[in-house]
Protein backbone atom coordinates (compact mmCIF):
# COMPACT_ATOMS: atom_id res chain seq x y z
CA UNK A 1 0.00 0.00 0.00
CA UNK A 2 1.28 3.44 -0.91
CA UNK A 3 1.92 5.90 1.88
CA UNK A 4 1.70 9.64 1.26
CA UNK A 5 2.47 12.46 3.67
CA UNK A 6 -0.69 14.57 3.83
CA UNK A 7 0.17 18.25 3.96
CA UNK A 8 -1.80 20.38 6.40
CA UNK A 9 -4.35 21.52 3.85
CA UNK A 10 -5.16 17.96 2.82
CA UNK A 11 -5.53 16.93 6.45
CA UNK A 12 -7.88 19.86 7.09
CA UNK A 13 -9.90 19.19 3.92
CA UNK A 14 -10.33 15.52 4.82
CA UNK A 15 -11.56 16.23 8.35
CA UNK A 16 -13.62 19.43 8.06
CA UNK A 17 -16.92 18.73 6.32
CA UNK A 18 -17.59 22.36 5.34
CA UNK A 19 -14.07 22.96 3.98
CA UNK A 20 -14.14 24.17 0.37
CA UNK A 21 -12.09 21.13 -0.76
CA UNK A 22 -13.65 18.51 1.53
CA UNK A 23 -15.57 16.64 -1.18
CA UNK A 24 -12.59 16.70 -3.51
CA UNK A 25 -10.23 15.38 -0.82
CA UNK A 26 -12.62 12.66 0.36
CA UNK A 27 -13.31 11.53 -3.22
CA UNK A 28 -9.56 11.40 -3.93
CA UNK A 29 -8.90 9.44 -0.75
CA UNK A 30 -11.72 6.97 -1.37
CA UNK A 31 -10.55 6.33 -4.94
CA UNK A 32 -7.00 5.41 -3.98
CA UNK A 33 -7.19 4.76 -0.24
CA UNK A 34 -3.49 5.29 0.40
CA UNK A 35 -1.99 5.13 3.82
CA UNK A 36 -1.62 8.72 4.96
CA UNK A 37 1.19 9.91 7.15
CA UNK A 38 1.07 12.91 9.43
CA UNK A 39 3.85 14.61 11.32
CA UNK A 40 3.89 17.24 14.08
CA UNK A 41 3.83 20.03 11.49
CA UNK A 42 0.73 18.77 9.66
CA UNK A 43 -1.02 17.80 12.88
CA UNK A 44 -0.32 21.28 14.23
CA UNK A 45 -1.84 22.77 11.09
CA UNK A 46 -5.05 20.82 11.69
CA UNK A 47 -5.21 21.80 15.36
CA UNK A 48 -4.55 25.49 14.61
CA UNK A 49 -7.25 25.51 11.91
CA UNK A 50 -9.85 23.86 14.14
CA UNK A 51 -9.14 26.02 17.18
CA UNK A 52 -9.04 29.22 15.09
CA UNK A 53 -12.43 28.16 13.67
CA UNK A 54 -13.91 28.09 17.17
CA UNK A 55 -13.59 24.40 17.98
CA UNK A 56 -12.73 23.79 21.63
CA UNK A 57 -9.18 22.58 22.16
CA UNK A 58 -10.33 19.25 23.62
CA UNK A 59 -12.62 18.69 20.62
CA UNK A 60 -9.82 19.57 18.19
CA UNK A 61 -7.56 17.04 19.88
CA UNK A 62 -10.37 14.47 19.62
CA UNK A 63 -10.51 15.06 15.84
CA UNK A 64 -6.77 14.49 15.60
CA UNK A 65 -7.03 11.40 17.80
CA UNK A 66 -9.73 10.05 15.47
CA UNK A 67 -7.44 10.52 12.47
CA UNK A 68 -4.58 8.80 14.27
CA UNK A 69 -6.82 5.84 15.25
CA UNK A 70 -7.39 4.79 11.63
CA UNK A 71 -5.64 1.77 10.11
CA UNK A 72 -4.57 3.93 7.16
CA UNK A 73 -2.72 6.40 9.39
CA UNK A 74 1.04 6.47 9.96
CA UNK A 75 2.81 9.00 12.20
CA UNK A 76 6.25 10.26 11.25
CA UNK A 77 8.19 12.23 13.86
CA UNK A 78 9.88 15.23 12.32
CA UNK A 79 13.25 14.34 13.82
CA UNK A 80 15.08 15.93 10.92
CA UNK A 81 16.79 19.33 10.88
CA UNK A 82 15.60 21.96 8.45
CA UNK A 83 19.15 22.07 7.09
CA UNK A 84 18.51 18.83 5.19
CA UNK A 85 15.41 20.28 3.52
CA UNK A 86 16.90 21.48 0.28
CA UNK A 87 15.47 24.94 -0.16
CA UNK A 88 16.04 24.98 -3.91
CA UNK A 89 13.44 27.09 -5.61
CA UNK A 90 12.14 28.59 -2.37
CA UNK A 91 11.38 32.26 -2.98
CA UNK A 92 9.15 33.02 -0.01
CA UNK A 93 8.68 32.16 3.64
CA UNK A 94 5.54 30.13 2.97
CA UNK A 95 7.52 27.63 0.92
CA UNK A 96 9.93 26.69 3.71
CA UNK A 97 7.47 24.26 5.32
CA UNK A 98 6.72 22.75 1.90
CA UNK A 99 10.43 22.08 1.38
CA UNK A 100 10.64 20.45 4.80
CA UNK A 101 7.60 18.23 4.20
CA UNK A 102 8.99 17.10 0.84
CA UNK A 103 12.33 16.26 2.47
CA UNK A 104 10.56 14.33 5.24
CA UNK A 105 8.51 12.37 2.71
CA UNK A 106 11.61 11.62 0.65
CA UNK A 107 13.36 10.38 3.78
CA UNK A 108 10.53 7.83 4.05
CA UNK A 109 10.68 7.10 0.29
CA UNK A 110 7.25 8.63 -0.18
CA UNK A 111 5.63 11.76 -1.59
CA UNK A 112 3.58 14.67 -0.26
CA UNK A 113 -0.15 14.78 -1.01
CA UNK A 114 -1.25 18.38 -1.46
CA UNK A 115 -3.93 20.70 -2.82
CA UNK A 116 -1.19 23.22 -3.68
CA UNK A 117 -0.42 23.24 -7.40
CA UNK A 118 2.57 25.50 -6.72
CA UNK A 119 4.12 22.83 -4.51
CA UNK A 120 3.57 20.24 -7.24
CA UNK A 121 5.07 22.58 -9.85
CA UNK A 122 8.17 23.06 -7.71
CA UNK A 123 8.64 19.49 -6.46
CA UNK A 124 7.06 17.46 -9.27
CA UNK A 125 7.56 13.75 -8.73
CA UNK A 126 8.02 14.23 -4.99
CA UNK A 127 4.41 15.38 -4.65
CA UNK A 128 0.89 14.35 -5.66
CA UNK A 129 -1.97 16.73 -6.35
CA UNK A 130 -5.25 15.86 -4.64
CA UNK A 131 -7.99 16.11 -7.25
Question: What is each residue range found by the language model?
Answer:
Residues 124-131:
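Active-site regions of enzymes building and remodeling cell-envelope glycoconjugates
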Residues 32, 123-124:
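Short, structured coil segments at secondary-structure junctions
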Residues 7, 38, 94-95, 116, ...:
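Histidine- and aromatic-rich ligand-binding microenvironments
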Residues 70-117:
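Active-site neighborhoods of divalent-metal-dependent phosphate/nucleic-acid chemistry enzymes
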Residues 1-38, 50-62:
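Short, well-structured N-terminal submotif of metal-dependent ribonuclease cores
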Residues 10, 42, 81, 118-119:
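Alpha-helix capping/helix-boundary segments
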